[in-house]
């Protein structure tokens, strides 16, 4: 039995039993993947996968039990590697943070700067993407930490912690008629073309929910992942923007005005996610404590324990 066999089994499930994709992910050949799986089945005396000819079509009942053990072994192998690096170099390494564009641009800079001053030997790799990709990267070990507002609490193999609450603001050019609406109503917004985030990004769900609750259909003419892109098109007069409050800066965003909208849209909570059972280097705990001061190392360690093992 070897780790390549275990990785082949895990990746086969993750890639929907497509051996071509498994081979690409593991930098090997499709026949090589098939051989690794077959040799493991022969050694264990168990058929792990259901087959249709040479194609894998699913997991057998025994295979489902094998998969759980395989995943646990691979997590522990990664933990062992991390632990050995920890003892070899306490304050040297790379911290991989998967994060949405808005969090990377507006929420993280202060924490990253403070962390780098405290740990100059640690590189930070910011991996920006959508929340679903962030969750996937943390689950697969491609990222140590995930940060997003949407979606992270939906995965049972992730543990997530609240970092901070925030609301949306409405952004308009100077002199816009909505500036005279005090307080601003959802009905007022419904009469204007809107520019906001893509579905699944930066609290978009709460924006949509507010219009649904009011029985209104918003005229969303343009969407983007990035707050700066949204503000740019607002400045061109293409519509009214709805962005995260931390994405608007009165000094920097010349020619634009922000209108308070916390009474229109439900508040959002940015969360930080880790893979259950993962081993974190000491500096990772320091980073988390800087970005989410209310979360302690003891709390994180308790939450990271595999299901059924927490005290």
Name the predicted role of every residue range.
Residues 41-61:
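A short LG(V/I)-centered, amphipathic sequence patch enriched
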Residues 43-44, 66-88, 287:
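Alpha-helical linker/hinge and terminal dimerization helices associated
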Residues 130-143, 149, 200-259, 307:
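Hydrophobic hinge/microswitch elements
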Residues 178-179, 193-214, 280-289, 294-308:
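Secondary-structure junction motif
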């Amino acid at each position: 039995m070897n780790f390549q066999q275990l990785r082949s089994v895990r990746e086969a499930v993750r890639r929907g039993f497509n051996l071509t994709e498994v081979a690409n992910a593991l930098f090997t050949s499709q026949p090589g993947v098939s051989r690794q799986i077959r040799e493991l089945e022969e050694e264990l005396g168990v058929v792990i996968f259901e087959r249709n000819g040479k194609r894998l079509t699913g997991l057998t009942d025994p295979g489902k039990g094998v998969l759980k053990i395989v995943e646990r072994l691979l997590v522990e192998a990664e933990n062992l590697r991390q632990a050995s690096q920890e003892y070899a170099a306490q304050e040297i390494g790379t911290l991989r943070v998967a994060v949405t564009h808005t969090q990377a641009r507006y929420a993280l800079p202060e924490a990253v700067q403070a962390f780098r001053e405290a740990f100059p030997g640690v590189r930070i790799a910011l991996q920006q993407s959508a929340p679903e990709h962030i969750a996937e990267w943390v689950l697969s070990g491609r990222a140590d930490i995930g940060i997003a507002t949407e979606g992270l609490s939906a995965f049972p193999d992730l543990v997530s912690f609240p970092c901070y609450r925030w609301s949306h603001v409405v952004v308009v050019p100077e002199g816009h008629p909505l500036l005279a609406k005090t307080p601003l109503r959802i009905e007022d917004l419904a009469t204007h073309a809107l520019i906001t985030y893509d579905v699944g990004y930066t609290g978009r769900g709460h924006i949509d929910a507010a219009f649904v609750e009011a029985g209104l259909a918003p005229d969303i003419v343009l969407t983007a992942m990035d707050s700066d892109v949204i503000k740019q098109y607002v400045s061109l007069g293409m519509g009214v923007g709805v962005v995260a409050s931390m994405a608007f800066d009165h000094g920097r965003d010349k020619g634009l005005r922000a209108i308070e909208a916390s009474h229109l849209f439900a508040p959002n909570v940015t969360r930080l996610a880790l893979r259950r059972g993962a081993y974190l280097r000491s500096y990772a705990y320091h980073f988390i404590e800087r970005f989410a001061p209310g979360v302690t190392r003891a709390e994180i360690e308790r939450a990271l324990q595999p299901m059924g093992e927490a005290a």
